[in-house]
Amino acid sequence: MESKTLFLMALGIWLQSLTTTRGWVAADDRITGGRDFIDIESKFALRTPEDIAEDTCHLIPGVTESVANCHFNHTSKTFVVIHGWTVTGMYESWVPKLVAAPYKREPDSNVIVVDWLSRAQQHYPVSAGYTKLVGKDVAKFINWMAEEFHYPLDNVHLLGYSLGAHAAGIAGSLTNKKVNRITGLDPAGPNFEYAEAPSRLSPDDADFVDVLHTFTRGSPGRSIGIQKPVGHVDIYPNGGTFQPGCNIGEAIRVIAERGLGDVDQLVKCSHERSIHLFIDSLLNEENPSKAYRCNSKEAFEKGLCLSCRKNRCNNLGYEINKVRAKRSSKMYLKTRSQMPYKVFHYQVKIHFSGTESDTQTNQVFEISLYGTVAESENIPFTLPEISANKTYSFLIYTEVDIGELLMLKLKWKSDSYFSWSDWWSSPGFTIEKIRVKAGETQKKVIFCSREKVSHLQKGKASVVFVKCHDKSLNKKSG
């Protein structure tokens, strides 16, 4: 699998090198700043809602009239977008989308795109080293805006992707006053996993630093995205590794069906998902995705972390609550494979009673949830092991809001292979109650068997459970 991943990454890079786009900027296409800013190579384009794809107007440090010419709004928020490494020296397709989304949410804001394409186009280690110079450029620009125009840094929000996240962090560490916020969008891992805080994104770089980790697969230092927490709040959607719809099998299927044209997008799909999750949070403000603090993704998969007490849950993206703990908090959530990404999380606890002495491993079940608004049927889940007279907790999620839970069905699936023992005598357990906690509402519900006690048998019909208890369940959970 690792060799397939490396092959597809290399293939994606090669395909990128064959493409062209109107966003290309020649290395010698210089925009000269004022006398005190002659060493700044990065360019700062103020894009407009009417022209999200082109750098038509540049804010030039030291040239005050450039700010007026670009119609910079001095009383509104400013989003500063910093791209990452590029093979082609071109803007990637996500840039206009990330420009458009803040304007839809904050119509009077300023969205500035930092162009460091000529430096970002080098071999990766060289471009990684350039993040320090880019960070200095951005800091000088921000300091100039603050000093020359008294622009408040409380209005500045840096959005850095991949290498751009570390450039944003370095910029934040060098401004005269702290900027309001830095959002790191899957900060790059290689060359930064073991770097000291001054050389990478860290919580000290802004008043608040939030980070999305979406492609951390692989050993530390070799994964595309940085694995360790580097902000006040670090969120790991789907465990922070591969994202839904981005797996290698999907890439191979697309190659077979459509040829090589789209494979480069699939290769970087999980890395870029961080950007689209943030865009989603800007566009779908009424339904923010919720993440939950947890010590490990394994504990999260067991449903053990769906608590919102003492800031243990938070919104993903733009509407995040700015919680500044003494140490970084790692948070997890599940998402859909496409926008809107929000899902609804549930912890399910089942006590299996019986006289079976054997331990069953890797058993597949299906659960169906029925609510006041909708239903979600045949949700598969696997328990690594089950044995009699033990309670098991696990996480499930639905892609639709089903409302208040009313009923559920549980089915124990047959093995995919033929088993004489199962054919001769199907194993089973008795289940009296099932406990469910909804992460988004924090409500707990106990379901009872419709027959007082249900006998769940492998490969047999589903058993039905109905709501049986309402008393004092919906207090704040622990």
Curated annotation (Swiss-Prot):
Localization terms from the record: Cell membrane; Secreted; Secreted, Extracellular space, Extracellular matrix
Top-level lineage group: Eukaryota
UniProt-recorded Gene Ontology molecular function terms: apolipoprotein binding; heparan sulfate proteoglycan binding; heparin binding; lipoprotein lipase activity; lipoprotein particle binding; metal ion binding; phospholipase A1 activity; triacylglycerol lipase activity
Stretch forming the signal peptide: 1-23
Active site: 162 (nucleophile), 186 (charge relay system), 271 (charge relay system)
Processing after translation: Tyrosine nitration after lipopolysaccharide (LPS) challenge down-regulates the lipase activity.
Coiled coil: none
Domain PLAT: from-to ranges: 344-467
Keywords linked to the UniProt accession: Calcium, Cell membrane, Chylomicron, Disease variant, Disulfide bond, Extracellular matrix, Glycoprotein, Heparin-binding, Hydrolase, Hyperlipidemia, Lipid degradation, Lipid metabolism, Membrane, Metal-binding, Nitration, Secreted, Signal, VLDL
Record's catalysed reaction(s): a triacylglycerol + H2O = a diacylglycerol + a fatty acid + H(+); a 1,2-diacyl-sn-glycero-3-phosphocholine + H2O = a 2-acyl-sn-glycero-3-phosphocholine + a fatty acid + H(+); 1,2,3-tri-(9Z-octadecenoyl)-glycerol + H2O = di-(9Z)-octadecenoylglycerol + (9Z)-octadecenoate + H(+); 1,2-di-(9Z-octadecenoyl)-sn-glycero-3-phosphocholine + H2O = (9Z-octadecenoyl)-sn-glycero-3-phosphocholine + (9Z)-octadecenoate + H(+)
EC numbers: 3.1.1.34, 3.1.1.32
Activity regulation summary: The apolipoprotein APOC2 acts as a coactivator of LPL activity. Ca(2+) binding promotes protein stability and formation of the active homodimer. Interaction with GPIHBP1 protects LPL against inactivation by ANGPTL4.
Modification 3'-nitrotyrosine occurs at: 124, 194, 346
Keyword Secreted listed: yes
GO BP of this protein: cholesterol homeostasis; chylomicron remodeling; fatty acid biosynthetic process; fatty acid metabolic process; high-density lipoprotein particle remodeling; response to glucose; triglyceride catabolic process; very-low-density lipoprotein particle remodeling
Region (Important for heparin binding): 433-437
Paired cysteines (S-S): 57-70, 246-269, 294-313, 305-308, 448-468
UniProt keyword annotation of Signal present: yes
Annotated segments matching region Interaction with GPIHBP1: 35-56, 446-470
Binding of Ca(2+), residues: 197, 200, 202, 205
Noted disease: Defects in LPL are a cause of chylomicronemia syndrome, also known as type I hyperlipoproteinemia. Animals exhibit reduced body mass, growth rates, and increased stillbirth rates.
Subunit and partners: Homodimer. Interacts with GPIHBP1 with 1:1 stoichiometry. Interacts with APOC2; the interaction activates LPL activity in the presence of lipids. Interaction with heparan sulfate proteoglycans is required to protect LPL against loss of activity. Associates with lipoprotein particles in blood plasma. Interacts with LMF1 and SEL1L; interaction with SEL1L is required to prevent aggregation of newly synthesized LPL in the endoplasmic reticulum (ER), and for normal export of LPL from the ER to the extracellular space.
Similarity remark: Belongs to the AB hydrolase superfamily. Lipase family.
Role, per record: Key enzyme in triglyceride metabolism. Catalyzes the hydrolysis of triglycerides from circulating chylomicrons and very low density lipoproteins (VLDL), and thereby plays an important role in lipid clearance from the blood stream, lipid utilization and storage. Although it has both phospholipase and triglyceride lipase activities it is primarily a triglyceride lipase with low but detectable phospholipase activity. Mediates margination of triglyceride-rich lipoprotein particles in capillaries.
Name of the featured protein: Lipoprotein lipase
Gene that produces this protein: LPL
